[in-house]
């Protein structure tokens, strides 16, 4: 018997394994599945944040209704209105006890905002900038369907009336368009500045680069002479071009400014526009958010609806007025 008879025979059959093509296919499929899972998780988180934002507006609406049942009028617009309903929102007394006490705004002696820490319910978690400052807030009352200016009084055809004026109080009986068809409050993105968070953040120098990257967080100026309401569309076209520069948004950041308000002059998530002419002293300041396709809007009956960016302009205008007599079908 030869020596070779005792040596094991080697199999000529190829061993099973992955080819490079198969490996690449597996990696590609894994990457696609991972991206789908991440997208689903992110979408789910944003849906949860949008629902939380809707819940905040609903609680604000309920607090306003309770405030009305106590005082017989709606709270004044701006920060002070939010301060007055804060005990009804989170149970903390704040600086003024509104339970059973007359509204200082109604008596013509409205205090300044002062050093006030905002309740968490006034923050929308979809906007990461709410964590930057102590006094920034996400929500604002409706100033109606017309221009308004900081410090002006009694200029709103909505439920908010600009600055404090004891002769311009509004009650539910003044909302003849119906509580279910009249917007009460919505949301706005907080503006950005180039300095660290502080009480005087709004005094920081304007940062054009930040504004260009975040156009919905600022009020954009116009350079042309627009002095009549019918010129508003021309003014907006100039503002949308971004050529005129911008200023920090007074109604979002900081929250210690008197008039956190928005109006229905432009559709949701449009640029805010500030005219240059003195006869148009207030901006066109629509609600803005990071929610996909629209914003949450709270109504005077306590309900909250999601309004898409492409809403019919006439319907949007009608939702802003309290006594315009328009129909708001189509929302």
What are these regions (language model features)?
Residues 14-49, 59:
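N-terminal single-pass transmembrane signal-anchor helix
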